[in-house]
């Protein structure tokens, strides 16, 4: 059975890039364009890992992370953002990993594989 990853990012290009790249790695990928949509998707689906942007309109990624950890305590969340300074914020420490967005997705793919193989 394929692992299911939920990609949450307000930028459509990023969502589609991650979907394509992660499907090539053999994952099933669901998409959400906002924090609100992500929480709805988690209620509806069996997701194995969440790839979550921080800076989004509405509910930001740090708040989404907090809500995920309240309801789905063991669900791994990887924060993936263009802003490295958020790594120092206490609210991000509940994530399993913090990746700075890059056009080279090797680090991201390796971290996802590592987390799902635990």
Residue ranges and their predicted role:
Residues 2, 46-48, 72-76:
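His-Asp phosphorelay/catalytic-motif detector in bacterial-type signaling
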Residues 16-24:
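Charged docking surfaces used in two-component/phosphorelay signaling
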Residues 31-40, 61:
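Helix N-cap/capping motif at the beta->alpha junctions
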Residues 40, 62-73:
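Short amphipathic alpha-helix used as the core "switch/output" element in two-component signaling
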Residues 56:
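Receiver (REC) domain active-site loop signature in two-component systems and cognate sites
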Residues 63, 83-101, 106-110:
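Alpha4 helix (beta4-alpha4-beta5 surface) of REC/receiver domains from two-component response regulators
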